[in-house]
Swiss-Prot record:
Cellular component aspect of the GO annotation: cytoplasm
Protein name (database record): Chaperonin GroEL
Biased composition (Gly residues): 538-547
A Pfam short name: Cpn60_TCP1
Encoding gene (name): groEL
A single BP term in Gene Ontology: protein refolding
EC number: 5.6.1.7
Entry keyword set: ATP-binding, Chaperone, Cytoplasm, Isomerase, Nucleotide-binding
Length: 547
């Protein structure tokens, strides 16, 4: 076992503070509309320029092991806030640094760390309750655009695009962010249900210009097994051909004789048909086939349910107004399923999302939900250079997460003012002793820090003066760092999602409390590389003197 180095009490906390400060001081320069960029060196390719707190935090690794522990604890604040709310990572870092700094002063003066922690926890609970109290719900396109604009570092183009995307696909719709081929940033909306499976043969194409199979007023056969034998497929083919409507076949696979027969009949004009593989794998495939069946009013022909392909009737087939199939994707528009069944399926998937513990599963469930409830919006991000593209794409993703958070829990006034207004909630925090009262006061002081930092980043105004002026005001009155004016911030579009502000404070207090109650740090003793024996001359043994 490797020998360990142990550092105790004041020495340990002082070193942890150095690490906390190194990370926080690097991250907090990005806060607010006047925040600066941070340039990050990459081993390969061009450096990355970013104004995203969590991106900066994730890049910081310190040489000293205990300092690095402090830095990594605060990095956890940024990461957790990003995971939960998608934004507010810099605010969380600033709050964590302030709580730890003020707490350390009191521990050094003889306060009991565990009572400080209890006071901090009680204070945070009351502040969160006050934030919820002053929160207001959002629904309009204009309010959604405001949240997106602020989270994208005051880029109104991005705010408008996100608002338009949400307007098109709904609150539960999937909005994906991709890199555009050109310089233009644009929104593309895919109506209906799209899945990533294209036609099994180019001979199914009906439009040779676009290389797509276009089926109008189509029937849909949904089967969860492979189809290789024409005999089992023939009865349902004959029944659908009699109706004169085109047919889309979705199955695990279609091969051999069955595929060849379909292609020949399609070329002769006997059948209007197209065949695609079923989307997904395993249990997810079964669920997606069921989604398609409900959306189109059809039935999944599955032997597990007692249905056989050779006995299938036209009643088992789904229906859609239009289906478009290219070499990569199938899009079903205006499925003829009943609204009651579709709503029931949507609620079922929402329930699964609430119970899901895996980020991957949640993402896939949300995709399925969107395909059932309104479609998919794609934001194609354009820029002049790759460096600008990556930076802009990161901002769009942040703004998208923040906007979703705002829809969930509402918004509060931005610019650090909501935390100032929430200070009045501390009057409800009860302390059992002086040290707990000190813990409450630590939060009181820390809540001012984001506003101080936003002002400091403007480089032109005194933070203490601004803080006093904002405290004297009420409601939405605050300092707009972009225009350097005192005004009604909500009217000026300076708002934050309540979830972002709440998560930032909760996560910051949690990690700062852990650091305050730390009494010892254990690290590996670093090996001294200079003590390593030198390689003997003449190369490696058995290599004949080769290097």
């Amino acid at each position: 076992m490797t020998a360990k180095d142990i550092l105790f009490d004041a020495d340990a906390r002082a070193k942890l503070k150095v690490g906390v400060d190194k990370l926080a001081n690097t991250v907090k320069v990005t806060l607010g509309p006047a925040g600066r960029n941070v340039l990050i060196d990459k081993k390969f390719g061009a450096p990355t320029s970013t104004k995203d707190g969590v991106t900066v935090a994730k890049e910081i690794e310190l040489d000293d092991a205990i300092e690095n522990m402090g830095a990594q604890m605060v990095r956890e604040v940024a990461s957790k806030t990003s995971d939960v709310a998608g934004d507010g990572t810099t605010t969380a870092t600033v709050l964590a640094q302030a709580i730890y700094r003020e707490g350390l002063k009191n521990v050094a003066a003889g306060a009991r760390p565990i009572d400080l922690k209890r006071g901090i926890d009680r204070a945070v609970k009351e502040v969160v309750a006050e934030l919820r109290n002053i929160s207001r719900s959002i629904s309009g396109k204009k309010e959604i655009a405001q949240v997106g604009t602020i989270s994208a570092n005051n880029d109104p183009e991005i705010g408008e695009l996100i608002a338009e995307a949400m307007d098109k696909v709904g609150k539960d719709g999937v909005i994906t962010v991709e890199e555009a081929k050109g310089m233009e940033t644009e929104l593309k909306v895919v109506e209906g249900m799209q899945f990533d499976r294209g036609y099994l043969s180019p001979y199914f194409v009906t439009n040779s210009e676009t290389m797509e199979a276009e089926l109008e007023d189509a029937l849909i056969l949904i089967h969860d097994k492979k189809i290789g034998n024409m005999k089992e497929l023939l009865p349902i083919l004959e029944k659908s051909a009699q109706s004169g409507r085109p047919l889309l076949i979705i199955a695990e696979d279609i091969e051999g004789e069955a595929l060849a027969t379909l292609v020949v009949n399609r070329l002769r004009g006997t059948l209007k048909v197209c065949a695609v593989k079923a989307p997904g794998f395993g249990d997810r495939r079964k669920a997606m086939l069921e989604d398609i069946a409900i959306l189109t009013g059809g039935t999944v022909i599955s032997e597990e349910k007692g249905y056989k392909l050779e006995n299938a009737t036209v009643n088992y087939l789904g229906q859609a107004a239009r289906i478009t199939v290219d070499k990569d994707n199938t899009t079903i528009v205006e499925g003829k399923g009943t609204q009651d069944e579709i709503k029931a399926r949507i609620n079922e998937i929402k329930g699964q999302i609430d119970k899901s513990t895996s980020d991957y599963d949640t993402e896939k469930l949300q995709e399925r939900l969107a395909k059932l409830s309104g479609g998919v919006a794609v934001l194609n991000i354009g820029a002049s250079t790759e460096v600008e593209m990556k930076e802009k794409k990161a901002r769009v993703e942040d703004a998208l997460h923040a906007t979703r958070a705002a829809v969930q829990e509402g918004i509060v006034v931005g610019g650090g003012v909501a935390l100032i207004r929430a200070i009045k909630g501390l009057s409800n925090a009860i302390a059992d002793n002086e040290d707990q009262k000190t813990g409450i006061d630590i939060i009181r002081r820390a809540l001012e820090e984001p506003l101080r930092q936003i002002v400091a980043n403007t480089g032109t105004t005194d933070g203490a003066v601004v803080l006093e002026r904002v405290k004297q005001g009420e409601g939405d009155f605050g300092f707009n760092a972009r225009t350097e004016q005192y005004e009604d911030l909500v009217a000026a579009g300076v708002v934050d999602p309540t979830k972002v502000t709440r998560s930032a404070l909760e996560n910051a207090a949690s990690v700062a409390s852990i650091l305050l109650t730390t009494e010892a740090c254990i690290t590996d003793i670093k090996e001294d590389k200079s003590d390593m024996p030198a390689m003997p001359p003449g190369g490696m043994g058995g290599m004949g003197g080769m290097y």
